[in-house]
Design a protein with these regions (language model features):
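N-terminal hydrophobic/helix-forming segments and targeting peptides
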Residues: 1-180
């Protein structure tokens, strides 16, 4: 890597790959393709990306994880809303109205439901819902949702790879992918 632009392009590609905890193949495949430009690469039985360089010097290990926190579908209710559980370290306090992608039989965009301020009770003001109270609205009735989504499907938080001031960047998956 000779410059910021090259590092940024690699990081943007890694951060753009699918890889919610437990379903990291998209991100692992992207990492393997990029690593293969520099060394022989193989995948372990558990899906880890491994590469090594031959040499006579000291041995070092570079180790990182590649998953992204997200959610996992647990059920589809009678109105077509998806019930979910944490998949990784999802923080309930920041989920209200978040845009998400459900990785079912095809990718489906949705939004995490929230109670509008004019419908919330004064005692609920400023409080996050419990995980068993949140749902994802994918704009489908139950029958249509059941054709595309199943319990166990992963849900990723949408967010773009964002250039910030100077040479800084941000992405929902940057905490894990930057180490790769």
């Amino acid at each position: 890597m000779e410059n910021y632009s090259e590092v940024r392009a690699i990081l943007e590609r890694l951060c753009g790959a699918k890889g919610v905890s437990g379903a990291e193949d998209g991100a692992a495949n992207a990492a393997a393709e990029m690593l293969a430009e520099y060394m022989p690469v193989h995948r372990s039985a558990l899906g880890s990306v491994c590469g090594s360089l031959e040499g006579s010097g000291a041995h070092i290990l570079l180790d990182a994880h590649i998953d992204q926190i997200g959610l996992v579908v647990t059920a589809i209710d009678d109105d077509g809303f998806l019930k979910v559980a944490k998949c990784g370290g999802a923080d309930i306090r920041v989920l209200a109205a978040a845009e998400v992608t459900v990785h079912g039989k095809k990718d489906i965009h949705g939004v995490i439901t929230s109670t509008p301020p004019h419908l919330a009770s004064p005692s609920d003001e400023g409080k996050a819902k419990a995980f068993d109270e949140i749902a994802i609205d994918i704009g489908m009735k139950k029958e249509a949702a059941l054709e595309l989504v199943s319990p166990g499907d992963r849900v990723a938080f949408d967010g773009r790879f964002l250039s910030m001031l100077g040479s800084r960047v941000s992405s929902p998956s940057i905490d894990d992918r930057a180490g790769v």
